[in-house]
Amino acid sequence: LVLYADMNNLKIINDRYGHEEGDYSLHTIAEILAEIVQKEQTGDGVVARIGGDEYACALMTEKKKELLLQELYDAFTVRNEQSDKPYNVTVSIGACALEPGDEHSLADALSLADEQLYEVKKLRKKDVAKIPLQA
C-alpha cells in the first residue's frame, strides 16, 4: 500500500501562529503516520517526508486500504480533540494498493497516489481518494 499525504493549511498555521507551530504540526503528522505504519505493517514499511508538507508511506499490510485510511482519519481526529492548540492538524491523502504479482512499480503507485491526492485537494476535501493501478 502506498500513501501520499499532504498537510492542509500549513501556510495559514505558520502565518497565524508562527513557524514553531507549523513545525509542531509537521512533527504531529509524521508521528501519526509512523504509528499507523508501525502498527499495521506485516512486512517492511517506511514513512518519509518528501518535501515541504508532503509525506509518502509504503507498507505491506493485510488490512484493506479503506480500513487503514479510516484508522488514519480517526488518529488525526483523536489527536485534534486532545490537543490544546487553536487549530486542527489535517492531511489530504491519496492511496494506491499494489497487489501480489502486480507488474507496476512502487514509483508507479506513488505517482498514482500523488494524482489522487491532488484530486482531493482540488475538491477541497479533507478526505482520501483511491485509484486502481489500471488508470
Where are these regions (language model features)?
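Catalytic-core segments of nucleotide cyclases and related cyclic-nucleotide turnover enzymes
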Residues: E62, Q70-Y73, T77, E81, ...
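Cofactor-binding loops of NAD(P)H-dependent oxidoreductases
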Residues: A5, C96
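Conserved long alpha-helical elements within nucleotide-processing catalytic cores of c-di-GMP signaling
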Residues: L1, N8-E35, A48-G52, A56-C57, ...
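Generic enzyme active-site microenvironment
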Residues: Y4, T90
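A short pre-motif secondary-structure segment
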Residues: G43-R49, Y87
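Alpha-helix termini
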Residues: V37-D44, N80-S83
